[in-house]
Amino acid sequence: MFAIIETGGKQYKVQQGDVLKVEKLEANPGDVVEIDRVFAVSKDGELKVGAPTVEGAKVLLKVEDHGKGKKIIIFKYKPKKNYRRKQGHRQAFTQVRVEAIQA
């Protein structure tokens, strides 16, 4: 059984027990978050596709941890003008585990 969900403006294909990193959620570690933006659910070989979402379907995610991703460097410069700007960024994420898919 799998589902396609949306959280943080991105879509994920999830199964029960999967661990994934999503955009930061406002929840504490140990909390259970309910996602109702479910676009498709497959159960026993039968695929239900929503228009745009599947009615009554939801996915329960358990928050395990919060963190920051790998640092990326933004470097801007203009040749011959002595203009240089260096900036770093680390994207915040939430690590979640899929507890249940309810369809």
UniProtKB/Swiss-Prot annotation:
Gene Ontology BP, a term: translation
SUPFAM superfamilies: L21p-like
Signal peptide range: none
Protein's recorded name: Large ribosomal subunit protein bL21
Family of the protein in this entry: Belongs to the bacterial ribosomal protein bL21 family.
PROSITE patterns xrefs: RIBOSOMAL_L21
Function as written in the Swiss-Prot or TrEMBL entry: This protein binds to 23S rRNA in the presence of protein L20.
Pfam families per the UniProt record, alphabetical: Ribosomal_L21p
Subunit structure: Part of the 50S ribosomal subunit. Contacts protein L20.
Annotated GO MF terms: rRNA binding; structural constituent of ribosome
Gene encoding the protein: rplU
Entry keywords, A to Z: Ribonucleoprotein, Ribosomal protein, RNA-binding, rRNA-binding
CC terms in the record's Gene Ontology section: cytoplasm; ribonucleoprotein complex; ribosome
